[in-house]
Amino acid sequence: MKKALQVAMFSLFTVIGFNAQANEHHHETMSEAQPQVISATGVVKGVDLESKKITIHHDPIAAVNWPEMTMRFTITPQTKMSEIKTGDKVAFNFVQQGNLSLLQDIKVSQ
């Protein structure tokens, strides 16, 4: 009987130990997914630095399934706009964030 009691107690504590481990949560920092940076080319149709907008007639953009069209992009703080003017052919990168197309980088191209 004593042996049976020892086996029962051992089993009970083993089950409790495994259950405690199963309920332990590892609260590791989850990295947020980086937004997709999309590259495109087009022609600048207008620059409005006051409202932080640039209008570009861009070629089709397969990454977001967009046809060729003219649209406004939001100029972000890291965007260097010093040499960009209306009529320039440009290569640019942007991030789509909801309804906003956030310009990340833009360069005059040939």
From Swiss-Prot:
<keyword id="KW-0186">Copper</keyword>
<dbReference type="Pfam" id="PF11604">
    <property type="entry name" value="CusF_Ec"/>
</dbReference>
<protein>
    <recommendedName>
        <fullName>Cation efflux system protein CusF</fullName>
    </recommendedName>
</protein>
<feature type="signal peptide">
    <location>
        <begin position="1"/>
        <end position="21"/>
    </location>
</feature>
<comment type="subunit">
    <text>The cus efflux system is composed of CusA, CusB, CusC and CusF.</text>
</comment>
<dbReference type="GO" id="GO:0042597">
    <property type="term" value="C:periplasmic space"/>
</dbReference>
<dbReference type="InterPro" id="IPR042230">
    <property type="entry name" value="CusF_sf"/>
</dbReference>
<keyword id="KW-0574">Periplasm</keyword>
<keyword id="KW-0732">Signal</keyword>
<keyword id="KW-0479">Metal-binding</keyword>
<dbReference type="InterPro" id="IPR021647">
    <property type="entry name" value="CusF_Ec"/>
</dbReference>
<comment type="function">
    <text>Part of a cation efflux system that mediates resistance to copper and silver. Binds one copper per polypeptide.</text>
</comment>
<dbReference type="GO" id="GO:0046872">
    <property type="term" value="F:metal ion binding"/>
</dbReference>
